[in-house]
Amino acid sequence: MYNNVVSGIFNNFIQNNISCLRFNFRGVGNSTGNHSNGTGELNDTKACVDFLVNEQNIEKLLIYGYSYGAAIGCSTVNYSKNIIGYCAISFPWDFMGLEYKKLSQCEKPKLFIQGNRDRLAIYENFKTHYDFYLDPKRYKIINEADHFYLGFEQEVAKETYEFYRSIIE
Amino acid sequence: MCGTEKIFINNNEIKLEAELFLSSAENLHKATLICHPHPQFLGI
């Protein structure tokens, strides 16, 4: 279970003593099952939300997702009242279709992080997609970063932590 | 990472690989959920 972006965020939360759970979707790493084109993955995220709320007594939950994880994770934002917002890193709207854009619409706080050299979450289309979303929302452009954020992990982690502090603390 | 726990979360017949960190009482009842990317999507 390693990805440079997710590990940067995860480790930064731990260093700041913030409870966090990260997971692999079905069919990835040691998770069982097979990829199901989003339907099953939405349920995977909901299962993790249920685990935190019902088994760990979490009352306020922020969802973070990167790339495919942003499209799926943020699309569960309206699943529970305990989810109070989300942060999407390189939301791949142009590859995922309108369904996930609609599912991730909400009136909860949202942060979108985007690299200006990203060709998977296409930077040139970012503002058009961003404008679709209701307030409260904000975005952060990471200059010179592409979809993989190599060398920019700390900058991403810093933004995600500040978002957490602005919402929860 | 010290202080984390490797777990599996059940989703019906699926077992999801996960890593959990629970903070001290100061931040109890608050958490973040981080969704990994899909390697096929990243082309790796």
PLM feature spans:
Chain A
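Serine-hydrolase catalytic machinery in alpha/beta-hydrolase-like enzymes
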Residues: 1-56
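Active-site nucleophile loop of the alpha/beta-hydrolase fold
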Residues: 66, 87-96, 115
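Short beta-strand/loop motif that positions the catalytic acidic residue
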Residues: 106-107, 111-114, 118
